[in-house]
Amino acid sequence: RTLRRFQIAPGVHLSYDAAQKFNRCRISIHFAFPARRETATAHALLPLVMERGYADCPDMTQMTKKLARLYGADLTVDARPMGCSHNLCVSITGIKDQFALEGEKLTQEYAALALGTAFHPYFVGSTFDPEAVGIEKQMLKKALEDEVNDKRLYCQRQANRAPPASGRRAT
């Protein structure tokens, strides 16, 4: 495997794997920034809002159509804590150019979509679309309430979050 990783800005990396044995390719852009309690809600909402669209493709319907035209490419925006940092990953997966029926340059379109999502989000004025943020906030709140109500899942997640006071993880 030939995984290549390029820093395209401080704390921002582009990863590229030129493996020939697969018929699909993936482009990922990773952002790393300090994890802070006071920004936890914003960090949880950010990928949900970013996945809805970007400046050149501002809504979910347009985004879905664009991905369908790219032979069902898949765009994901994911965020997760990694030690003392928070990692945001914008990733797109789709078929390689050589499998395009009409010779389309799909990889260029994948890169444009990933870069647009990462660096040119859809703003209303100078902020994310308040309607999209409100919808995603409600959906996230419901998901968290559902998790708390699912006692078994809630206990599992709490057990995996922090070690007991003795410093040893329960088994």
Give the ranges of each region predicted by the language model.
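Short, Gly/Pro- and small/polar-rich lid/capping loops
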Residues: 1-11
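Generic secondary-structure boundary/loop-capping signal
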Residues: 11, 72-74, 130
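M16 family metallopeptidases and their MPP-like homologs
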Residues: 15-17, 23-38, 43, 60-120, ...
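Active-site SXXK
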Residues: 44-51
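Short, polar/flexible loop-turn hinges at active-site or ligand-entry regions and domain interfaces
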Residues: 53-56, 98-101, 120-129
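Conserved phosphate/pyrophosphate-binding and hydrolysis machinery centered on Walker-type P-loop NTPases
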Residues: 130-133, 149
